[in-house]
Structure formats: structure tokens, C-alpha cells
Curated annotation (Swiss-Prot):
Protein name in the entry: Glutamyl-tRNA(Gln) amidotransferase subunit C, mitochondrial
Subunit structure: Subunit of the heterotrimeric GatCAB amidotransferase (AdT) complex, composed of A (QRSL1), B (GATB) and C (GATC) subunits.
Function comment: Allows the formation of correctly charged Gln-tRNA(Gln) through the transamidation of misacylated Glu-tRNA(Gln) in the mitochondria. The reaction takes place in the presence of glutamine and ATP through an activated gamma-phospho-Glu-tRNA(Gln).
Any one biological process term the GO annotation gives: glutaminyl-tRNAGln biosynthesis via transamidation
GO terms for cellular component: glutamyl-tRNA(Gln) amidotransferase complex; mitochondrion
Amino acid sequence: MWARAVHLGLRAAARGRRGFTSKADPQGSGRVTGELIQHLERLSLVDFGSQEAVARLEKAIAFADRLRAVNTDGVEPMESVLEDRCLYLRSDNVVEGSCAEELLQNSHRVVEEYFVAPPGNISWSKLDEKQPFSHR
């Protein structure tokens, strides 16, 4: 019951917001600078080393600019794309247990009983060549 009240309160608060603020160029020049690429690579750990990757990024930015231009005044935000029906959660029944060791054997790398995945589209070999991240 309380979760529904909190959800409705958050939804009402979200209606009052007109949009998000961003440091991005509001006109959407569409050009991606070297400085921006370095910043995005640092944030996302995705390598934009090829012209094809940069072109794909510029295309995604242009698409986002087109979406930003859509007039959504007076449009109620949706809770779900399936608002016309009830979505019930299934019961969570554990069928097997104590199989963590078996599952972790499927991973390329494991650290302290956790899967370690390569970030973004940077392969393990490229990561091994780079300096480790400094934790500040």
C-alpha cells in the first residue's frame, strides 16, 4: 500500500519537471570533438577508435536531437507500456541451489565469487595493455 503511495507521489513530482538540464549544445551541432570522445571513453569504457564508431555515435546523437524536438506538452507519463492490463509477479521458487561454483567455471574471469565482464567493446587484451584505473 505504501509503495503505491510513494510511486504516485514520485509520478506527480515528475509531472512538474519540464525537462532535464544538460551541458550539451541545445542546438545539436552533431559534431563530435576529440575531447568529447575522450570523455565518453573514460565514462563508458567503450573504445571509439574507428571512424565507423564515431559515425555511429554522431548518428545516435542526431536521433536524440530529433527526439528532443518532439512536443510532449500535455502528454501524461506512462508507468508501463502495458498499462491496459495487470502485471502479476510470479512466485520465486528456487529449484536448485548451491551451484555457484559450477556456474562460475563458465566465466572467463572471476574475482571473489563474482563474474568479471570486459567493459563495453574493449577486449581483454586491450585492457591488459592499459594501466589500471586509479581509485580516488
